[in-house]
A protein has these predicted regions:
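Domain-level signature for soluble enzymes in the chorismate/prephenate branch of the shikimate pathway
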Residues: 1-262
Length: 262
């Protein structure tokens, strides 16, 4: 049975994504994204699942950096998960009894209007499922968690309300990561590039893709910690094949790495 590492407690959205990407796998929660990636790199798991972009909150930059920092890791797939947030309490609780809600800061932001309408105190936690586990363990009828329905099922919470997120069209995209030397196959790719420090270098790099009919889907810049004020760019591409991708990267030059084909 394959094992999949993710950040959070059982029932977290990353756990939901892991179960969708690798059906039948054993999923293992870790305390941070860094710890999940390190576990995969060390051979403690066969895969890792990392969130990389939320439709409301935007990208998760750290998880692109982790792919660069762990050269043996490659993207092997992706999935997009609809995010339904639930108000989860203990047995006997109701919306009327709640005075405080707990969850990850991103989840709390995504239910901001709902929470403000009830004038609840808000407390941040490290992950959504961890908040559910915490309130069930403590058994406070006045405290609820914001999290996925799976977390309520696993930890014995009671769903008091469903679909409480402010935006109905709320999705998170996840990468499936494996430890392998092979870049992979597929018509999508993610690459990391550090362009030269000269005028027009980023424009020229992006043109190298466009000139070969490679579609740019996503671009994020992150500081290169080794060189002050130098940036590394993570680029997600579509309509990719081996020859055209290799030709584009040859034109771009500099420090670069294919982080995965999928």
């Amino acid at each position: 049975m394959p094992t999949v590492a993710y950040q959070g407690h059982a029932g977290a959205f990353s756990d939901v994504a892991a179960r969708a990407l690798v059906p039948g796998a054993e999923t293992r929660g870790y305390g941070s994204f860094d710890a999940a990636a390190a576990a995969l790199d060390a051979g403690e798991a066969d895969y890792a699942v990392l969130p990389v972009e939320n439709a409301i909150a935007g990208p998760v930059p750290r998880n692109y950096e982790l792919l660069w920092e762990h050269p043996a890791l490659r993207i092997r797939g992706e999935t997009t998960l609809p995010i339904e947030l639930c108000l989860i309490g203990t047995a006997g609780a109701s919306e009327a009894t709640i005075r405080e809600i707990r969850s990850h800061p991103v989840a709390l932001e995504q239910v901001r209007r709902y929470a403000e309408a009830h004038d609840w105190q808000q407390t941040t936690t490290t992950d959504t499922a961890g908040a559910v586990r915490e309130i069930v363990t403590q058994g406070y009828p006045t405290v609820a968690a914001i999290g996925p329905a799976l977390a309520a099922d696993i930890h014995g919470g009671t769903i008091l309300a469903r679909g409480i997120q402010d935006e109905a069209e709320n999705y998170t995209r996840f990468f499936l990561i494996a430890r392998t030397d092979e870049a992979g196959a597929g018509n999508r790719a993610c690459v990391g590039i550090a362009v030269n420090d000269r005028p027009g270098s980023l424009r020229d790099a992006l043109s190298a893709f466009a000139d070969r009919d490679i579609d740019l889907r996503f671009l994020i810049a992150r500081p290169d910690r080794r060189v002050p004020f130098r940036y590394r760019f993570f680029v997600e591409l579509a309509n990719v094949d081996d020859a055209r991708l290799a030709a584009a990267l040859a034109v771009i030059g500099g420090e670069q790495r294919i982080l995965g084909r999928y």
